[in-house]
Amino acid sequence: MFSTSDQVSKMNSRILSALLILGIATCVIAGGFCPKSRHPQCNLSYKINDCCAQSDCRVGSVCCVEGCGNVCRAESDTPLGEKFVDGSECKHGHVFPKKWYQFWWRV
């Protein structure tokens, strides 16, 4: 037969396990926000995309849209910047604007 202290101990273990799982799930589900952009406007004639998906960034960082391209930034608690939407058109690296003749011919 189980004693009362064994039952209390098992119940406490189950409660702690449930709270731990809930805490981990909350951290995984909560996709952080982008902080305020450091450079909202860009003086370059091209963009530099360091990320084209949220999976391109390390854990604890998000892919954010900035003036000079997409960059991985540390997550913020408040939505101040623009988060990159996975599946949007994006090209890694230096991206130059199309030249006038490229609109008519696919170069």
UniProtKB/Swiss-Prot annotation:
Domain WAP: 31-76
Signal peptide: 1-30
Cystine pairings recorded for this chain: 34-64, 42-68, 51-63, 52-90, 57-72
Tissue expression remark: Expressed by the venom gland.
Post-translational modification: Contains 5 disulfide bonds.
Cross-referenced InterPro entries: Elafin-like_sf
SUPFAM superfamilies xref list: Elafin-like
Family: Belongs to the venom protein 11 family. 02 (wap-2) subfamily.
Protein name: U20-lycotoxin-Ls1b
Organism the protein comes from: Lycosa singoriensis
